[in-house]
UniProtKB/Swiss-Prot annotation:
Its EC number is 1.4.4.2. The glycine cleavage system catalyzes the degradation of glycine. The P protein binds the alpha-amino group of glycine through its pyridoxal phosphate cofactor; CO(2) is released and the remaining methylamine moiety is then transferred to the lipoamide cofactor of the H protein. The gene is gcvPA. Pfam families: GDC-P (PF02347). It comes from Nitratidesulfovibrio vulgaris (strain DP4) (Desulfovibrio vulgaris). This is Probable glycine dehydrogenase (decarboxylating) subunit 1.
């Protein structure tokens, strides 16, 4: 419905009703010198003018490019039913369901989401989501700090640099000791990580697959951490969890993920959702909403928000986090996506993505001067070292309609010639072949 502003007559009637002469009188309690002299806003536009302006801006978008970008965010196919079901008014307008008697549908959907992600990651408990993968990782670190009463955190440098930047920002005033262990050609340095985990450490924080696409089994590292009474925290890629060793199998205490790859379009970076799971002993440390299943006095199944004493709206001073919202709609989309695909469909999505990535790696490394950054297993994403600048390659091929990947040197000094290439089930073998031919033409 278009916004229809108040007419001068409407404003006059409202001012008369509340007993003032002008709108400025409403702010009489604020000293004049503290009020802004001008808001420096342009003149308002009509609805037609606004639509024309937005259409002109949207026309500048490139929708015809073939993109091999990844770096933590992936263009997987989203079944049309996800949009159709999640846009229903019963879900689309719902927020945190504080009144369970009026929101059983939403509460059950969140409960099923929690169940689904626990099964996917092989963990005991989950919350109703947080904002994104980075905020989930920060909250996981703070869970470890509270649970262990320690302030040292060991972080693998191969963890997403986007997440590491967020963690540095979040923790800048928390008097925590963040120890970043350098990677070795895109691989975690296991010996150095173990050496950094001691009796003062709250948690070791890793990612699988990591930013460079490398797949690693962290079972030994988590066992080592447990021997020092530290926690194992891992960030994972949900789609790949259908075929990889799970956090639960590795012995992780807390597992988080960005849920973008299951049901969320890339959409200029959001909205996404942060998935948080943990082992049962840590459930009272997990932030945000948790939906539980119970029975009413008549024996009927009901869904409620449970363990609310952890939350800010109940005990502000002692809450586990100041997060006071969640991504319920995005969580619903992820639930619908997972349900529509089922276990076999999710495995097939991962296998097709990995198949394309293997083919891409073979084609690209057949070019002169191109080699894989490391020889570790990878899933749907891999890094290659080029004989020229990756930034130059990205600029030249993007201008021709192909985004070849992500230039790793943007975040890692000394790696300007490293290109990170991601594939999903949406990429065809023909597109991969064209990428290889275009890259070969400029090397």
């Amino acid at each position: 419905m278009p916004f229809v502003p108040h007419s001068p007559e409407d404003v006059s009637v409202m001012l008369d009703a509340i007993g003032v002469n002008t709108i400025e009188d409403l702010f009489a309690d604020i000293p004049a010198e503290m009020r802004p002299k001008s808001f420096a806003l342009p003149k308002g536009l009509s609805e037609m003018d606004v639509c024309s302006r937005l259409e002109a801006l949207s026309a500048r978008n490139r929708t015809d490019v073939v993109s091999f970008l990844g770096a933590g965010f992936y263009d997987h196919h989203i079944p049309k039913a996800v949009d159709a079901l999640s846009s229903r008014g019963e879900f689309y307008t719902a927020y945190t369901p504080y009144q369970p008697e009026a929101a059983q549908g939403t509460l059950q959907a969140i409960f099923e989401f929690q169940t689904a992600v626990c099964r996917l990651l092989d963990m005991d408990c989950a919350n109703a989501s947080v904002y994104d993968g980075g905020s989930a990782l920060f909250e996981a670190m703070m869970m470890a700090v509270r649970a262990t009463r320690r302030r040292k955190l060991v972080i693998d440098e191969a963890l997403s640099p986007i997440y590491r930047t967020m963690l540095a920002s979040y923790t800048s005033n928390l008097q925590l000791e963040l120890v970043t262990v350098p990677h070795r050609d895109g691989l975690p340095d296991m010996d150095a990580l173990k050496a950094s985990v001691d009796d003062t450490c709250a948690a070791v924080v890793v990612q699988n697959p990591n930013f460079f696409g490398a797949i690693t089994d962290f079972t030994d590292l988590f066992t080592h951490a447990r021997a020092h009474k530290a926690l194992g925290v891992i960030s994972v890629y949900p789609v790949m969890q259908s075929v990889l060793k799970t956090p639960g199998e590795m012995g992780a205490d807390i597992a988080v993920a960005d849920g973008q790859s299951i049901g969320q379009p890339l959409s200029f970076g959001g909205p996404y959702l942060g998935i948080m799971t943990c082992t049962k002993p840590l459930v009272r440390q997990i932030p945000g909403r948790i939906v539980g299943r119970t029975q009413d006095v008549d024996g009927r199944t009901g869904y409620v928000l449970t363990l609310q004493a952890r939350e800010q709206h109940i005990r502000r001073a002692k809450a586990t986090s100041n997060i006071c919202s969640n991504q319920a709609l995005c969580a619903l989309r992820s639930l619908i996506h997972l349900t529509l695909l089922g276990p076999e469909g999710l495995v097939r999505t991962a296998e097709l993505s990995m198949e394309r990535a293997r083919y891409a790696a073979e084609r690209l490394t057949a070019l002169p001067g191109v080699e894989l950054l490391h020889d570790a297993p990878f899933g749907n994403e891999f890094a290659v070292r080029l004989p020229v600048s990756a930034f130059e390659v990205v600029d030249r091929l993007t201008a021709r309609g192909y985004v070849p990947g992500f230039p790793v040197g943007r975040y890692y000094p000394g790696m300007d010639n490293v290109l990170l290439v991601a594939c999903t089930e949406k990429h065809s073998f023909e597109q991969v072949g064209i990428l290889a031919e275009m890259l070969g033409g400029i090397l």
